[in-house]
Amino acid sequence: MNTFGELFRLTTFGESHGPAMGALIDGCPAGVALSAAQVQTALDRRRPGQSAITTARAEADQVELLSGVYEGKTLGTPIAAVVRNQDARSQDYSALAREDRPGHADAVWRARFQHRDPRGGGRTSGRETLSRVIGGAVAEALLARELPAVRTVAWVAQVGPLAVTAPAQLTRAQVDAHPTRCPGPEATEIERLILAAKEQGDSLGGAIAVRIEGLPVGLGEPVFGKLKARLADAVAGIGAVTGVTWGGDEVLARLREPGSRFHAPRADGVPSEVYGGIQGGLSNGAPLSLRVYFKPPATLAAHATRGRHDPCILPRAVPVVEAMVSLVLADLHLLWLARPHRP
């Protein structure tokens, strides 16, 4: 499956070392303010080569909007966008046409399809996620018009053994202020940890936290399209994701409590944070929080003497997680509008 969503649909295409990566967004209503500059801003946050802790692959990731937008507004027709690959070094992967890399999808894709592109991982490369960021930028443009109070912010909450102490209120500008996208006092230490792993030819995993504010009450499509299920499906489809939790680590710690304490109502009447912003599969109006866990990258520089790789994908995965969340919210909003909800 290369298409995500029901009414607001994203189809991604392209291989890591092919001519281009691309996205086709269908179902976006007409009249939504959208420019190439908006999409480019999103792509720049995911772009490789941002700092010493990311891959050295030098890609400008300049987006071209081919259709669906005229005079700064969507037409209601399919929106096609491409990013040309400019710095692929396919010769680095010539040996992989005959052998499979440990920890990668090479062997299973060969078994499944009987034919694959070994250059840079082909379709399984993390480079595919730039197409998701394009789709997420369009989704955010729609949300800005339809649900202007919605704000989604993600940040690196843990790298290896180091957890981040983030403030209660965050903006993307605060998150992006440090190359690690760790908005806490641990940022410098985490940067040193990633650089040490890079120097040793090793890699690191960790977690990304997400907070969504301004959601209306009732967003979701029970029973199989619950908000929690749709978000989990969206972020679990990102390569290297190994788990999702709701409400943060503090909520996991409270699972040991008896129900009388766990479900105790707050004095101010606001839904308890233990629900993570979701009850009965629907948004409850409180901030929605989740945490997405990533395994360490499988390509280790200590073993792979050729090719270019991130020692830790978390800083560049932040905008990818935000994009997948926005795609879900945009799709569920259109479903809300399309289906009757009152007798």
For the regions a protein language model found, what residue spans apply to each?
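Generic N-terminal targeting/processing segments that precede catalytic cores or assembly contacts
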Residues: 1-343
